[in-house]
Swiss-Prot record:
<keyword id="KW-0679">Respiratory chain</keyword>
<keyword id="KW-0999">Mitochondrion inner membrane</keyword>
<keyword id="KW-1133">Transmembrane helix</keyword>
<dbReference type="GO" id="GO:0005743">
    <property type="term" value="C:mitochondrial inner membrane"/>
</dbReference>
<dbReference type="GO" id="GO:0042776">
    <property type="term" value="P:proton motive force-driven mitochondrial ATP synthesis"/>
</dbReference>
<protein>
    <recommendedName>
        <fullName>NADH dehydrogenase [ubiquinone] 1 alpha subcomplex subunit 1</fullName>
    </recommendedName>
</protein>
<feature type="transmembrane region" description="Helical">
    <location>
        <begin position="1"/>
        <end position="21"/>
    </location>
</feature>
<keyword id="KW-0472">Membrane</keyword>
<comment type="subunit">
    <text>Complex I is composed of 45 different subunits.</text>
</comment>
<dbReference type="GO" id="GO:0006120">
    <property type="term" value="P:mitochondrial electron transport, NADH to ubiquinone"/>
</dbReference>
<keyword id="KW-0249">Electron transport</keyword>
<keyword id="KW-0812">Transmembrane</keyword>
<keyword id="KW-0496">Mitochondrion</keyword>
<dbReference type="GO" id="GO:0005739">
    <property type="term" value="C:mitochondrion"/>
</dbReference>
<dbReference type="InterPro" id="IPR017384">
    <property type="entry name" value="NADH_Ub_cplx-1_asu_su-1"/>
</dbReference>
<keyword id="KW-0813">Transport</keyword>
<dbReference type="GO" id="GO:0031966">
    <property type="term" value="C:mitochondrial membrane"/>
</dbReference>
Length: 70
């Protein structure tokens, strides 16, 4: 019957899901708990560079917050 394909389909779905989740967790671990940002456009790149300059430690993912910016 049609339901005999469900176990194989679920195994295939899990195998396709694992690399995406693993990549997200590896990036989060290596970047100190922050998500990895990707600059697809020049404007996004300039925002990342601004965040890097503002952070004071030369890393775009370390935020100071608006109240701490001089």
């Amino acid at each position: 019957m049609w339901f005999e394909i469900l176990p194989g389909l679920s195994v295939m779905g899990v195998c396709l899901l694992i690399p995406g989740l693993a990549t997200a967790y590896i990036h989060r671990f290596t970047n100190g708990g922050k998500e990895k940002r990707v600059a697809h456009f020049g404007y996004h790149w300039s925002l990342m560079e601004r965040d890097r300059r503002i952070s004071g430690v030369d890393r775009y993912y370390v935020s100071k917050g608006l109240e701490n910016i001089d």
